[in-house]
Amino acid sequence: MLGSGLLLLAILAFLSVMVLVSVWQQKIRGKLPPGPIPLPFIGNYLQLNRKDVYSSITQLQEHYGPVFTIHLGPRRVVVLYGYDAVKEALVDHAEEFSGRGEQATFNTLFKGYGVAFSNGERAKQLRRFSIATLRDFGMGKRGVEERIQEEAGCLIKMLQGTCGAPIDPTIYLSKTASNVISSIVFGDRFNYEDKEFLSLLQMMGQVNKFAASPTGQLYDMFHSVMKYLPGPQQQIIKDSHKLEDFMIQKVKQNQSTLDPNSPRDFIDSFLIHMQKEKYVNSEFHMKNLVMTSLNLFFAGSETVSSTLRYGFLLLMKHPDVEAKVHEEIDRVIGRNRQPQYEDHMKMPYTQAVINEIQRFSNFAPLGIPRRITKDTSFRGFFLPKGTEVFPILGSLMTDPKFFSSPKDFNPQHFLDDKGQLKKIPAFLPFSTGKRFCLGDSLAKMELFLFFTTILQNFRFKFPRKLEDINESPTPEGFTRIIPKYTMSFVPI
């Protein structure tokens, strides 16, 4: 009995100390935004739903308002919720909020190099170069459009080969989207059955899946310890090395056949720039080339294929929407030519459907973490340099001020009274400010051309009753996952 009493007393004393330490931490934060009291080391981890962090964030903002602080383990994060707070930070204070925050899974691979996950002068130089180079290769222009059309033609042949049998469209769409960015980065496309290509897609998929999982969240919070422990993170570390080795080999292949007067792709352009900038502190070196190329490949492979896959599911759930898209395709494009990107200006309903698929899917509601680049005053709070920030882009996609029925799939959200496409300020699927997605114009073109080309050639059929379709993405940690399904592509 005495031993039990002493143990209970020790536990109570320990908890009391933890509470006192937490209160002390709150006081020394000064004018940081308010938030729930964190426990030492684990922060607010126990107060969050690990399977659905976005819902937990939404509940916290109802109590603390649109700007508040949470602790993810030892990491202190300021959360921005809603259009007004996000826009004020990322646009009105663009420079101050332009740093890249911590993402341990991707930092394991990129280590602060490359255009997407770097900071400071490195990020600025690489971003300027990448945007200019991608523009030179026709990003958003005719050159890339022809590559997308070619890839769309290959996809149509693959789908015709299924003869209307039920299939999981995931790998078909992943191969197609990845080949577009491959042609820009490497100057060539992969054969769809290429083992190296399939292995690459599998590894990237595993990294993305791990980053979104509850275990990935734990790794984000406690990576300094977990990287030495057994667990699924060890496979991610191995895959990261393999992905880097793959890209190094691609760069070496380009080096051996480089013509400085005739760049074939992004890698060539970077290599040529490296030759021009040979001073010691230049950011144009091999490590940044390898990691920037991997950045582009990651970003260009997953987003488009996931959006299309979810879009097909939604159209099967809403056959009236699919019918209207078919009607607009028949009226504007017909069946005797391939869709062109300029067609989107004459197809407001189809474009509204694509926008609504992006809004309703809301795959990454927490956005990509930012970091404060210098001491900043924001809405009466003081955010010291280095503070991590989560701009909750998902909160914009469900804001009833902009979308009348945010929980429903409804393309009318993007159409005015005359049936024309309308611009909605809160619709920011590619973020905004100085770190918006540099591939947004490519993604928009891919989504339109793949979507219309497929629907020009096929009708969609679900193998079971429409009531069996689960159209709601499943919360998975920091993200939302599309339900697995099969479908038939029925030739028209």
Swiss-Prot record:
It is a peripheral membrane protein. The gene is Cyp2a12. GO terms for cellular component: endoplasmic reticulum membrane. Heme binds at residue 437. It comes from Mus musculus (Mouse). Keywords: Endoplasmic reticulum, Heme, Iron, Membrane, Metal-binding, Microsome, Monooxygenase, Oxidoreductase. It catalyses: an organic molecule + reduced [NADPH--hemoprotein reductase] + O2 = an alcohol + oxidized [NADPH--hemoprotein reductase] + H2O + H(+). It comes from the Eukaryota. This is Cytochrome P450 2A12. Liver. The keyword Heme applies. Changing residue 209 to Q: Same as wild-type. Its EC number is 1.14.14.1. Its main location: endoplasmic reticulum. CDD domains: CYP2A. InterPro entries: Cyt_P450 (IPR001128), Cyt_P450_CS (IPR017972), Cyt_P450_E_grp-I (IPR002401), Cyt_P450_E_grp-I_CYP2A-like (IPR008067), Cyt_P450_sf (IPR036396), Cytochrome_P450_fam2 (IPR050182). Its cofactor is heme. Highly active in the 7-alpha-hydroxylation of testosterone. Belongs to the cytochrome P450 family. One of its GO terms (molecular function) is heme binding. It is found in: Endoplasmic reticulum membrane; Microsome membrane. It is an enzyme of class 1 (oxidoreductase).
